[in-house]
Amino acid sequence: MATIDVFDISKNKVGVMDLNDNVFNGEVKEYLIHEAIKVQLANRRAGTVSVKNRAIVSGGGKKPYRQKGTGQARQGCIRAPHFVGGGVAFGPRPKVYNLSMNKKARKAAVRSALSMLYKENKLSVLDSFTLPSISTKGFVTVLKAFDLAKTLVVVDEPNLNLELSARNVKDVKVLKAEHLNVFDIVKYNNIIVTQSAVRTIEGVLQS
């Protein structure tokens, strides 16, 4: 069984905890990680961008000038794409970009991402992550103790002091364990997890 050191917020070692091999020390399936990120990013897209083509743009029902005898190229409508004020040719239209991924594959992707960070020694476990007051300086001090910059902090319970202390720090995100996802794990590259959050993650992902 995989193990990991447990620290307090000053990076003093306070113990060792066992990790579920299936969740934190399993096979890293990069294709699943890629698929999960692709699905997440696609589902964020609103798909509402739209332009007017020549059928939609207002006006242009009349032929601008007669067919023959003017010496100019024949034209049927002043709202054709090559006219100023004309419709756009092949422009974007509203589209649904949503993709889906089954629950089993989605969980496997999160397990793979966590296993990847564990094997790269980018996973840190704290006994708890509580700040006595709202303090950005105090939060940054904790990150400096662990020599971390781009970091995802995963907690089990809502922690207002922690969330408000971290929200003005660049490249840091505080997330509840139940909202853990592949995109954030890969994006932030380092992850700090509380002991209780580890057990919550294992409970969700091992099933």
Curated annotation (Swiss-Prot):
Record GO cellular component, one term: ribosome
Pfam families per record: Ribosomal_L4
KW Ribonucleoprotein (keyword) present: yes
GO molecular function: rRNA binding; structural constituent of ribosome
GO biological process, one term: translation
InterPro entries named among the record's database cross-references: Ribosomal_uL4, Ribosomal_uL4-like, Ribosomal_uL4_dom_sf
Keywords (A to Z) from UniProt: Ribonucleoprotein, Ribosomal protein, RNA-binding, rRNA-binding
Function: One of the primary rRNA binding proteins, this protein initially binds near the 5'-end of the 23S rRNA. It is important during the early stages of 50S assembly. It makes multiple contacts with different domains of the 23S rRNA in the assembled 50S subunit and ribosome. Forms part of the polypeptide exit tunnel.
Family, as annotated: Belongs to the universal ribosomal protein uL4 family.
Subunit composition and interactions: Part of the 50S ribosomal subunit.
Protein name (record): Large ribosomal subunit protein uL4
